[in-house]
């Protein structure tokens, strides 16, 4: 083994020299990675033979065994999207109803990967991906390879900042040319290339792919008065900040800026997919607050999707985890928004009928939300003798009759034993936002299901090395990795489990809200629908769905089986104390507080069980008003909402 380690060390150092110094690599990234992983595996097993000049020991590169989860100290919210001027005007009206003199700042929406950087005493200590907004991946070593991200700030401060890592168009073209010459699959677009690069385990690959960044937010408490100050502060600290922006109180000015940027976007050296409009004043931002998903003080205008013509060659009908049958068109390949597209969703049978879509039609294809290829309409002038689309009457997986339920647009398979439905449910359970079982993807699920090794999610936890090795193409090392991932998933917070169960209408955020309130899946099973419905952000639809799911004996049995197999049923995040003095109340803070900061007041209220929101409505239970309270206090009084002062809060 010592001889092989020496050989690999020498060979890889030669390849590194070719790449970094000579700019003339003789092997592909794929071949380099393969040899690199062989070396690192051997070095782990025989550490006594590690060479001093091993690439794994070099400053320029580091092999990572994987990425640890990282709990963000401050949530990374997504933004509300807008696709029209009318939606921006509606946003403007909402903001101006609270702050008539509000000023906006418009910034470019960089098409890259969201990152969060934490510094202590000016030193970079953590770089992480966004993940689900609460938990991301720690990619610090890769972040350090982005040249314009400082390792040490110009000021010895402790701060968390947010921004976007991206790949320039020139770097993207250079990398794809190299991959083409090496016979490797090309990246679809710069965003995919940037995302794939930051998940590399070999940091030297990250270094040579020349990523860049733009920072735009101080996530930790800021001394700045407005967003413009934030950007100037970030630049003064040594970060790269995009200089193309506009400040105005007029949405007409903002729209003119959007139009100008859209006309010029092809001349930029990097990709953008829209414009982000924020309330400039940070105090106003705090007053406006957040919904369950996004800030009320910002909106992301997305540029209209690019459209291309393609011919429908055939249609596939597939079953989702809830039994919904989705038609997908197979197309003549086209280049669309930087990717090659050969399939596009047709949504549902009602959509096909409404648009009169037929096999053989020439259609207009676009990317819905700039992500999912979809058929927009038929090019009628190019229709010949195409026949109406044949609609399936039976499930393509289990041959059961399909149903078209009243008030639904989708065909649905309602056979609980449908193989496709079960497999999709298993895939969902193992997915990243659910139980995050790495290695248990669609291909492995299909093999396990076909071999009758798993029938429901509880069966996942009785898989063994011997049973996995009976599957074709599964080696001992990959089987053990899968078992380790399964074992690790047992300790997930129970909101991940709840989401993984695939209960209708219960998404990831609803799962977290439910478990924050009830503390465990077992407590939730015993909860009445009224106590569920009163949780802010949920309602009766989700409450009924939860009640109906746990009313089924097989659902209860599944939970008990998972518990017996060691799966955690408790919520591991911060729980809501249902006995707290203000539990269940929706509270709004307004005006200037004298003895407390607004953040201190917010934290005290939340610790007492209240939900603090940014705007007054009929759902508001209480308003705490400081001095110089304005329109929110007036609105509270007009609605008959109870109003208290700061002294009342201090005495609680």
From Swiss-Prot:
Gene3D superfamilies: 5' to 3' exonuclease, C-terminal subdomain (1.10.150.20), 6.20.10.30, BRCT domain (3.40.50.10190), DNA ligase/mRNA capping enzyme (3.30.470.30), Helix hairpin bin (1.10.287.610), Nucleic acid-binding proteins (2.40.50.140). DNA ligase that catalyzes the formation of phosphodiester linkages between 5'-phosphoryl and 3'-hydroxyl groups in double-stranded DNA using NAD as a coenzyme and as the energy source for the reaction. It is essential for DNA replication and repair of damaged DNA. This is DNA ligase. GO terms for cellular component: cytosol. It comes from the Bacteria. CDD domains: BRCT_DNA_ligase_like (cd17748), LIGANc (cd00114). GO terms for molecular function: DNA binding; DNA ligase (NAD+) activity; metal ion binding. Belongs to the NAD-dependent DNA ligase family. LigA subfamily. Pfam families: BRCT (PF00533), DNA_ligase_aden (PF01653), DNA_ligase_OB (PF03120), DNA_ligase_ZBD (PF03119), HHH_2 (PF12826), HHH_5 (PF14520). Its EC number is 6.5.1.2. InterPro entries: BRCT_dom (IPR001357), BRCT_dom_sf (IPR036420), DisA/LigA_HHH (IPR041663), DNA_ligase (IPR001679), DNA_ligase_AS (IPR018239), DNA_ligase_CS (IPR033136), DNAligase_adenylation (IPR013839), DNAligase_N (IPR013840). Its cofactor is Mg(2+); Mn(2+). It catalyses: NAD(+) + (deoxyribonucleotide)n-3'-hydroxyl + 5'-phospho-(deoxyribonucleotide)m = (deoxyribonucleotide)n+m + AMP + beta-nicotinamide D-nucleotide. The active site is at residue 109. NAD(+) binds at residues 29-33, 78-79, 107, 130, 164, 278, 302. SUPFAM superfamilies: BRCT domain, DNA ligase/mRNA capping enzyme, catalytic domain, Nucleic acid-binding proteins, RuvA domain 2-like.
């Amino acid at each position: 083994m010592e001889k092989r380690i020496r050989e690999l060390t020498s060979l890889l150092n030669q390849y590194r020299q070719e790449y970094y110094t000579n700019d003339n690599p003789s092997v592909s990234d794929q071949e380099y990675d393969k040899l690199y992983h062989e070396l690192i595996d051997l070095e782990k097993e025989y550490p006594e033979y590690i060479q001093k000049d091993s690439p794994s020991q070099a400053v320029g590169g580091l092999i990572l065994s994987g990425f640890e989860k990282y709990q963000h100290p401050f949530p990374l919210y997504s933004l509300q999207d807008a696709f029209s001027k009318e939606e921006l005007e509606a946003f403007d009206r909402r903001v101006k109803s609270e702050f008539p003199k509000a000023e906006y700042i418009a910034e470019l929406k960089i098409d890259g990967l969201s990152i969060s950087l934490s510094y202590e005493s000016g030193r970079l200590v953590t770089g992480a991906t966004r993940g689900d907004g609460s938990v991301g991946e720690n990619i610090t070593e890769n972040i350090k390879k982005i040249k314009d991200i400082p390792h040490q700030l110009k000021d010895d401060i402790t701060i968390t900042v947010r921004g976007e890592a991206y790949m320039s168009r020139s770097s993207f073209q250079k990398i794809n040319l190299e991959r083409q010459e090496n016979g490797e699959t090309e990246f679809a677009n710069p965003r995919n290339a940037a995302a794939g690069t930051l998940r590399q385990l070999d940091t030297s690959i990250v270094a040579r792919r020349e990523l860049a960044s733009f920072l735009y937010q101080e996530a930790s408490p800021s001394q700045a008065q407005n967003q413009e100050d934030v950007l100037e502060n970030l630049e003064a600290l040594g970060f790269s900040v995009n200089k193309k922006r506009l400040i105005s109180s007029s949405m007409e000015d903002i729209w003119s800026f959007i139009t100008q940027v859209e006309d010029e976007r092809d001349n930029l050296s990097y990709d953008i997919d829209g414009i982000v409009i924020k309330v400039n004043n940070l105090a106003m931002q705090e007053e406006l607050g957040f919904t369950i998903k996004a800030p009320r003080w910002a909106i992301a205008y997305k540029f209209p999707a690019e459209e291309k013509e393609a011919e429908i060659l055939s249609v596939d009908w597939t079953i989702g985890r809830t039994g919904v049958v989705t038609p997908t068109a197979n197309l003549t390949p086209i280049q669309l928004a930087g990717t090659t597209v050969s399939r596009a969703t047709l949504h549902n049978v009602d959509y096909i009928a409404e648009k009169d879509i037929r096999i053989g039609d020439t259609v207009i294809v676009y990317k819905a939300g700039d992500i999912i290829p979809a058929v927009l309409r038929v090019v009628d002038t190019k229709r010949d003798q195409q026949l109406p689309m044949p609609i399936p009457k039976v499930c393509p997986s289990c041959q059961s009759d399909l149903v078209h339920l009243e008030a639904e647009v989708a065909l649905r398979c309602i056979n609980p034993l449908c193989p496709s439905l079960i497999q999709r449910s298993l895939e969902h359970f193992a997915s990243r936002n659910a139980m995050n079982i790495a290695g248990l993807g669609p291909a492995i699920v299909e093999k396990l299901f076909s071999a009758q090794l798993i029938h429901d999610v509880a069966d996942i936890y009785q898989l063994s090395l011997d049973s996995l090795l009976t599957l074709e193409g599964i080696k001992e090392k990959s089987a053990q990795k899968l078992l380790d991932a399964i074992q690790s998933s047992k300790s997930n917070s129970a909101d991940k489990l709840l989401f993984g169960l695939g209960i209708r209408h219960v998404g990831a955020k609803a799962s977290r809200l439910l478990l924050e309130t009830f503390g465990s899946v077992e407590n939730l099973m015993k909860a009445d629908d009224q106590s569920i419905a009163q949780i802010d952000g949920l309602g009766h639809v989700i409450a009924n769905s939860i009640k109906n799911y746990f009313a089924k004996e097989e659902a209860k049995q599944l939970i008990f089986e998972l518990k017996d197999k060691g799966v955690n049923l408790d919520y591991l995040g911060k729980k809501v104390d249902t006995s707290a003095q203000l539990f269940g109340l929706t509270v709004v803070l307004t005006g200037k507080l004298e003895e407390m900061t607004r953040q201190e007041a917010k934290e005290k209220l939340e610790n007492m069980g209240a939900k603090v929101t940014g705007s007054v409505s009929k759902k508001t239970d209480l308003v705490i008003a400081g001095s110089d309270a304005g329109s929110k206090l007036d609105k509270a009084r007009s609605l008959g909402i109870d109003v208290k002062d700061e002294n009342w809060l201090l005495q609680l």
